From Swiss-Prot:
Residues 1-35 are annotated as: Disordered. This is Deoxyguanosinetriphosphate triphosphohydrolase-like protein. One of its GO terms (biological process) is dGTP catabolic process. It comes from the Bacteria. Residues 69-205 form the HD domain. Belongs to the dGTPase family. Type 2 subfamily. Keywords: Hydrolase.
């Protein structure tokens, strides 16, 4: 089959007509499948809109063209749908999981998550996947008959298990919900969820290269340190001699995305043909993931990640901003603990213990955008770092 062509629906895909349903039963939609309905609910949620002002690597006011969690999620969804189409899987469920995967991230990217996890260490820590589950099952308040978005079992399973089974140290937010609606934490997730997870990796690799080039943290020729990228750059230079770096970089990103999508599709098809799953049940009970990079491509992908770690994520300019961002999150947490009156009215209502209060404060901070966190810090402190 040609790359990009839609395969017939596979027997191991998740069939919306055979969904395991929702925690709160609802009448079916006259115009949309259950998974399309899930996707639309994510898109229309408040948490999804907030991703517009949440950091990937660069803080929101560093430039209008850098990725945010919103643009990243859209790019993950585009890649995931392409893979789902080639493998005969449900595109709507795949898109739902791609769009929802970052809903639980706090402000300031991984720096914000590290800081919030440290602040909450004595109270169970902070896990962004558990926070995503809380958002879609409790925190969104948009419907008269239920809290959250009341997503299907398949969407909730994919949100929780897209990176694999949860055997040990299950975050309390996930364990508590699982007691009400068993997501079979011990098993692998659907192929749709596995695709969403790999698509996240593909989008990160390609688009962090794009943002790093745009920020001047490295050049196209610096990327020749990565053997796979050196070969791609050589091909680009032969086909387009004298091309300016802006266009060389853009062409490299396109080539990389296409290469990784094709590699994942081919390897996943090989694994599926060996395993011969005949249903989503077979996929979940398989001994390992069925969506993956081939071994040689996985090595190339790891080399790209090492390059980005050394030249971008550990760059002093980025590190300085992230240190200041961690300080902002820690300052806010400490102030809200010491002075609950600085929180919005009613936010700690019903909290009977220090742990309850700490977790509620953590939820409040996790929901902030970068911009709101900075505004709050300005309101509560005499001096706020300039994240530039």
């Amino acid at each position: 089959m040609s790359v990009g062509m839609a395969a017939p629906r596979a027997p191991y895909s998740c069939d919306p007509d055979r969904s395991r349903g929702r925690l709160v039963a609802e009448p079916p939609s006259r115009t949309r499948s259950p998974f399309r309905r899930d996707c639309d609910r994510v898109i229309h949620s408040t948490a999804f809109r907030r991703l517009k002002h949440k950091t990937q690597v660069f803080v929101f006011h560093e430039g209008d063209h850098y990725r945010t969690r919103l643009t990243h999620s859209l790019e993950v969804a585009q890649i995931a749908r392409a893979l789902a189409r080639q493998l005969g899987l449900d595109e709507d469920l795949t898109e739902t999981l791609a769009l929802a995967h970052d809903l639980g991230h706090p402000p300031f990217g991984h720096a914000g998550e590290r800081a919030l996890n440290r602040c909450m260490e004595a109270h169970g820590g902070f896990d962004h996947n558990a926070q995503t589950l809380r958002i879609v099952t409790t925190f969104e308040q948009r419907y008269p008959d239920f809290d959250g978005l009341n997503l299907t079992w398949e969407s909730l399973e994919g949100i929780v298990k897209h990176n694999g089974p949860l055997h040990e140290a299950v975050p309390s937010g996930i364990a508590d919900f699982n007691a009400r609606f068993d997501l079979e934490l011990w098993s692998y997730a659907s192929l749709e969820a596995q695709i969403a997870a790999l698509s996240d990796d593909i989008a990160y690799d390609a688009h962090d290269i794009d943002d790093g080039l745009r920020a001047g943290l490295f050049t196209v020729d610096d990327l020749r340190e990565v053997p796979l990228l050196e070969a791609m750059i050589g091909d680009i230079d032969r086909h387009y001699p004298g091309l300016v770096d802006l266009r060389r970089g853009a062409e490299l990103v396109r080539e990389l995305i296409s290469y990784l999508i094709a590699a994942v599709a081919a390897e996943s098809q090989r694994r599926i043909e060996r395993a011969q799953p005949m249903s989503p049940h077979d996929v979940r009970r398989h001994a390992g993931p069925l969506v993956a990079f081939p071994a040689d491509v996985a090595e190339h992908e790891a080399t790209i990640k090492r390059f980005l770690w050394q030249r971008m994520y550990r760059h002093e300019r980025v590190m300085r901003v992230m240190r200041d961002a961690e300080r902002i999150v820690a300052d806010l947490f400490g102030r809200y603990q010491a002075d609950p009156a600085s929180l919005p009215a009613g936010w700690l209502e019903g909290c009977d213990s220090e742990g309850d209060r700490a977790r509620r404060i953590g939820h409040f901070i996790a929901g902030m955008t970068d911009r709101f966190a900075l505004t709050e810090h300005h309101r509560l402190f005499d001096s706020t770092p300039d994240l530039r």
